[in-house]
C-alpha cells in the first residue's frame, strides 16, 4: 500500500488521522536570496520568483485576492508596525527585526494549528505515545497493508527517526513535549540544540549506500532524477561544480556531517539580514540607507512578495492582529 492508498483508507473511516511523519525535502535552510534571484532572473521569471519565494506557492493565492488598493492600504499599516521608534524611517535593522518576528510567529502559530491533533488526552502536553498513535497508529495496526519497498518515505523507517527527534526535543526527559519542546520537534531548524538532528536526517535522506557520507552522485540524485539517460541540463553540471568547489571542503570526493552542516546551515549568514538589505536596496530611491513609507508603497509589489508580510498572510489580517 502506498502513501496515497493509506490516506484514502484514513478518509474512508478506518481511522481518524491528522498527522504525518516529519519529512522535509528542502535541504538548504538559509538560502542566499540574491543567488536565488539571479538564477530566476536568468529565466526572465522574476515575478514568479517573488511570489513563490516570498509568498510560497499556496500563499501567493492570498495576494491574488487583494486589489492593489487593498494591498497598499494594509501594507501601509504594516509599515507603521515595522517603524519601531516612530521616526517615519524604516532602517535595515527594523526590517530585519520584523522579518525575524514574522518567521517566529509563523512557527509558533503552526504549532497552535496542529496541537489538538496530537494532544489526545487534552493535558496540554504531547507524549511520545500520543504522537506515535496520531501519526503511525494505522500503520502499526495494519503493517501488512504497506509496501515498504515502494513507499518513498517508509513508515517503518520514519517511526524510529521521529522517536529520536522527539527525544532530542524532550529537554526535561519526561517523554512528553510541552509547547516549546513540541515546537522544536516540528521546527528543529529554528532551535540550536536540534540542528545536529537536522544535519543527521539530511545525511540519512541522501546517503543511499549507507556509508555515512554523501558523494557527488548522491548529491545530484537528491535534486535531479536522470530518467531519460540523456545529457544532463546545464544547471546539473553547475551543481556538480558546486559540489566539487564548495560542498566537498576536504576534497575527498564526499561530504561528511560537518560538510553537510556547512552546506545547509552556512556559518555567519543571516537570512533576515540579507533579505532586509535587499528590500532597502531595491526600494531606497534617495539612497539614504533608509526607507520612508512612500518609498515602500511605491515598490509595494516587492513587499507583498517578501517575508516582511509573512508570506502574504499579514495583508489579509486585521490590523489589530498584527
From Swiss-Prot:
Which residues does Ca(2+) 3 bind?
Answer: 170, 172, 174, 181
Q: Which residues bind Ca(2+) 5?
A: 248, 250, 252, 254, 259
Main function = May regulate calcium-dependent activities in the endoplasmic reticulum lumen or post-ER compartment.
* Positions annotated with a glycan in the UniProt record: 44
- Residue positions annotated to bind Ca(2+) 2 are 119, 121, 123, 125, 130
All residue ranges annotated as the EF-hand domain in the record: 70-105, 106-141, 157-192, 194-229, 235-270, 271-306
User: Which residues of this UniProt protein bind Ca(2+) 1?
Assistant: 83, 85, 87, 89, 94
Would you identify the family this protein belongs to, as annotated? Answer: Belongs to the CREC family.
What positions does the entry give for Ca(2+) 4 binding? 207, 209, 211, 213, 218
Q: Which UniProt keywords apply?
A: Calcium, Endoplasmic reticulum, Glycoprotein, Metal-binding, Repeat, Signal
The residues listed in the UniProt record as binding Ca(2+) 6, with positions renumbered to this chain, are 284, 286, 288, 290, 295
What InterPro entries does UniProt report for this protein, alphabetically? EF-hand-dom_pair (IPR011992), EF_Hand_1_Ca_BS (IPR018247), EF_hand_dom (IPR002048), Rcn1 (IPR027241)
Q: Which residues cross the membrane?
A: none
The record places the motif (Prevents secretion from ER) at 319-322
Annotated compartments: Endoplasmic reticulum lumen
What's the source species for this entry? Takifugu rubripes (Japanese pufferfish)
Q: Single GO cellular component annotation?
A: endoplasmic reticulum lumen
SUPFAM superfamilies for this protein:
EF-hand
What is this protein's record name? Reticulocalbin-1
Amino acid at each position: 500500500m502506498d502513501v496515497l492508498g493509506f490516506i484514502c483508507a484514513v478518509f474512508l473511516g478506518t481511522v481518524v488521522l491528522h498527522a504525518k511523519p516529519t519529512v522535509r525535502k528542502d535541504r538548504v535552510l538559509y538560502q542566499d536570496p540574491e543567488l536565488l534571484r539571479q538564477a530566476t532572473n536568468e529565466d526572465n521569471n522574476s515575478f514568479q520568483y517573488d511570489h513563490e519565494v516570498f509568498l510560497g506557492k499556496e500563499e501567493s493565492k492570498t495576494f491574488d485576492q487583494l486589489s492593489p488598493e487593498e494591498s497598499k492600504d494594509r501594507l501601509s499599516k504594516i509599515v507603521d508596525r515595522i517603524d519601531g521608534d516612530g521616526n517615519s524611517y524604516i532602517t535595515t535593522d527594523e526590517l530585519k527585526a520584523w522579518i525575524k518576528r514574522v518567521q517566529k510567529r509563523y512557527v509558533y502559530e503552526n504549532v497552535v494549528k496542529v496541537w489538538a491533533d496530537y494532544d489526545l488526552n487534552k493535558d496540554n502536553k504531547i507524549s511520545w505515545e500520543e504522537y506515535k498513535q496520531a501519526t503511525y497508529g494505522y500503520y502499526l495496526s495494519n503493517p501488512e497493508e504497506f509496501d515498504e519497498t515502494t513507499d518513498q518515505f517508509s513508515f517503518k523507517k520514519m517511526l524510529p527517526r521521529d522517536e529520536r527527534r522527539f527525544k532530542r526535543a524532550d529537554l526535561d526527559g519526561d517523554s512528553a513535549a510541552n509547547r516549546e519542546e513540541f515546537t522544536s520537534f516540528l521546527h528543529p531548524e529554528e532551535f540550536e540544540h536540534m540542528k545536529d538532528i537536522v544535519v543527521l536526517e539530511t545525511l540519512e535522506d541522501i546517503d543511499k549506500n549507507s556509508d555515512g557520507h554523501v558523494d557527488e552522485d548522491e548529491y545530484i540524485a537528491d535534486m535531479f532524477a536522470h530518467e531519460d539517460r540523456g545529457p544532463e541540463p546545464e544547471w546539473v553540471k553547475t551543481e556538480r561544480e558546486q559540489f566539487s568547489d564548495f560542498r566537498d571542503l576536504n576534497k575527498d570526493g564526499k561530504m561528511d556531517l560537518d560538510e553537510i552542516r556547512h552546506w545547509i546551515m552556512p556559518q555567519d549568514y543571516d537570512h533576515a539580514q540579507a533579505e532586509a538589505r535587499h528590500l532597502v536596496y531595491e526600494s531606497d530611491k534617495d539612497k539614504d540607507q533608509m526607507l520612508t513609507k512612500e518609498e515602500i508603497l511605491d515598490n509595494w509589489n516587492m513587499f507583498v512578495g517578501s517575508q516582511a508580510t509573512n508570506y502574504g498572510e499579514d495583508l489579509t489580517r486585521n490590523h489589530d492582529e498584527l
